[in-house]
Amino acid sequence: MAQDATTYEMPTRRDFVKGGGTIVGGALLAGCADGGADLTRTATESAASATSDETYTVRMEPTGTVTFDRVPETIAGCDPTYIDMLVALGHGDTVESIRTRRQYLTTHYDELDGVSIDLSSLTQLASKKSGVSKEVFYEMDADLHLMDPHWLTRILDSWSDADVEEISKGVAPFLGNVIFRRTDPWHDYRYYTLYEAFEKVAAVVQERERFEAIRSIHEETVEAIEAGLPAADQRPDALLLYAPDEPEEFYPYRLSGKGANKEHFRTLGITDAFADTDVSGFSTSDSGSIDYETLLEIDPDSLLLRYRGKARTREAFEESIVSHVREHEVGSQLSAVKNDQIFRGGPIFCGPLHNLFMLERYAGLYYPDRFADGQIFDRDRLANVITER
């Protein structure tokens, strides 16, 4: 996609009334420049700051500052990472939309009593035929668009900056940052870690205590895992790849790169087997593939394979992907195949609740002798944090 040097300035202040309340939005959408223009804004030290007794502000790159006089009652989402945050904070019922339902894996909620989201009720934003329609945003009439506008202008390549301005003025402001990966050349503004972004969302819905409680569970889980890890030189490396059914080629991700969907692997000390190669990660400008010969040349300790569509059982994963790799003339020579170290790669969009389950799952898969007990965090404790008012 051609890059441009456009810096789009949102309205500095706008007012609109919904259901007796007002949300005042002001933001800057950073363009994707080749010319070196300054496209970032300094973030505030706190996730939210009060501007008066009745309003509060939340600031996030690249969208800038949004001022609220009440907690949003309806929120248009796109990235499941952020929707998982809202569910974690007890505000899943505010979510109006999602990019595509099939990309939002929700089976982990089944283990948390009282935690759920009705996927069928969410408006699906992306359409193969028509892209993303502005009319859908007018129809939803949400209080806030919790998404980086670059989802619409770059990743989905459906909107212009003028379209973003129109919806921001006519419906509601945007707030968000693409955090699921950091391989796109246009992402030259600040990147947020999973919990940095989560803290911003907690500020939006005014759930500081609930956020801190979940962060405590996360920190305790990480501490328990780190205490049980083997020495660094005894930890395996891995290739994280997208694999179609019966794969003949693979699309690489970089474990060493930033991205919320890889944070759990880094916590577990899984290193990137692409580290000493010139292979780059998947992005809007690079969707190159690699073949079995390249895999064998690298010969990683393990393979983490992602796939399209809904979550699959281990049996379905074996049947559609792994069996083909094992039977392939070159694939069968891989150390990961010989040692039975081929695992599902986990969701592309991984929020804070996903992250806890992924930490636990991969700790058991990679280090079964050290994490034989299975559960590392308390499901009931987590569910109570989410559901109690």
Give residue spans per PLM region.
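Structural recognition of the beta-strand scaffold that forms the well-ordered cores
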Residues: 76-77, 96-97, 144-148, 174-176, ...
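A short, structured surface patch at a secondary-structure boundary
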Residues: 74-160, 165-166, 273-276, 283, ...
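Solvent-exposed, polar/charged alpha-helical surfaces in well-ordered, non-transmembrane soluble domains
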Residues: 83-87, 135-139, 165, 169, ...
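Structured C-terminal subdomain patch of bacterial secreted/periplasmic proteins
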Residues: 185-192, 196, 305-389
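Bacterial Sec-exported substrate-binding components of ABC uptake systems
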Residues: 2-85, 209-245, 306-309, 322, ...
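Alpha-helical, coiled-coil/dimerization segments enriched in small aliphatic residues
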Residues: 251-286
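Extracytoplasmic ligand-binding site segments that recognize negatively charged/polar headgroups
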Residues: 102-108, 151-160, 175-197, 234-263
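Short, structured coil segments at secondary-structure junctions
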Residues: 91, 140, 169-171, 268-269, ...
